[in-house]
Amino acid sequence: MTLSLIIKWGGQEFPLSALSEEDTVLDLKHSLKSLTGVLPERMKLLGLKYKGKPAENDVKLGVLKLKPNTKIMMMGTREESLEEMMAPPPENDEVVNDFDIEEEVVEVENREENLAKISRRVKDYKIEILNPPREGKKLLVLDVDYTLFDHRSCAETGQELMRPYLHEFLTSAYEDYDIVIWSATSMKWIEAKMKELGVSTNSNYKITFMLDSAAMITVHTPRRGLVDVKPLGVIWGKYGEFYNKNNTIMFDDIGRNFLMNPQNGLKIRPFMKAHLNRDKDKELLKLSQYLKEIAQLDDLSELNHKHWERYLVKKQGQ
């Protein structure tokens, strides 16, 4: 029996009607390669489930019980697009130093060995999509420790250490941004903390996916030696049809995490000593307003996030 499917990718829809129930998921991917130029190993097909898990390449399409004209979202980037994305920017590109680090340290973003590490992460690091990326939305990448909660103070529950206005902040941000959590810890810890804070179960917003320390890379800097950083190129390389340097912003309390993407980082004030500061910390409340203001811009890379408060005061005074 012939199947009729509609594949959504890169803002376009591709109808497929040449496949049968005896064909496999891999056959489907090869058909898509001829239409999109994306290699099968670069593809991720959302919605194709078999026994509660993503369907493997050898699963026959017939057992998936697909209805006629089922729409399936495909993720993946062409090789040539990936190479272009991973390439260092032109020499005349001006990069604004968004945080207090030495200028020579910023140069690490252009080094071949660091770009090669990102390419390996794009190829090898597995991301579990919790909620599909939404077309037309910008990307907000959030650190956890000291950004969303105080992880050092003692308390009976995580709620006591949660940064004020966290859920209000995420609810507002979700209107304009897909939300990704990236912590320099293990995925098991991240999942537990998001559950404890009520983030993963909140019905007012959704987390697109989460990244752990394995998605980070180590870079060498002239004065600081080896440091671990969070390269946004890993996300852009995997989901370039949705996210890029022009529509992404990352919050972190550690400036060096932006070394590979200084233009996209906003250094948030760390939330510490929750019991003393819970009633006066309004960082997320103000940043929520900033995100709302800049969400209307076509290109976030032209902003200097170091001066986000100055930008907000200026906009609200108009």
UniProtKB/Swiss-Prot annotation:
Keywords: Hydrolase, Magnesium, Metal-binding, Nucleus, Protein phosphatase. Transmembrane segments: none annotated. InterPro entries: FCP1_dom, HAD-like_sf, HAD-SF_hydro_IIID, HAD_sf, Ubiquitin-like_dom, Ubiquitin-like_domsf, UBLCP1. Mg(2+) binds at D143, D145, D253. Signal peptide: none annotated. It catalyses: O-phospho-L-seryl-[protein] + H2O = L-seryl-[protein] + phosphate; O-phospho-L-threonyl-[protein] + H2O = L-threonyl-[protein] + phosphate. It comes from the Eukaryota. It is found in: Nucleus. GO terms for molecular function: metal ion binding; protein serine/threonine phosphatase activity. CDD domains: Ubl_UBLCP1. One of its GO terms (cellular component) is nucleus. Its EC number is 3.1.3.16. One of its GO terms (biological process) is regulation of proteasome assembly. Residues 3-81 form the Ubiquitin-like domain. The keyword Acetylation does not apply. The keyword Hydrolase applies. Its cofactor is Mg(2+). Dephosphorylates 26S nuclear proteasomes, thereby decreasing their proteolytic activity. Recruited to the 19S regulatory particle of the 26S proteasome where it dephosphorylates 19S component psmc2 which impairs psmc2 ATPase activity and disrupts 26S proteasome assembly. Has also been reported to stimulate the proteolytic activity of the 26S proteasome. This is Ubiquitin-like domain-containing CTD phosphatase 1. The lineage of its organism: Eukaryota, Metazoa, Chordata, Craniata, Vertebrata. The gene is ublcp1.
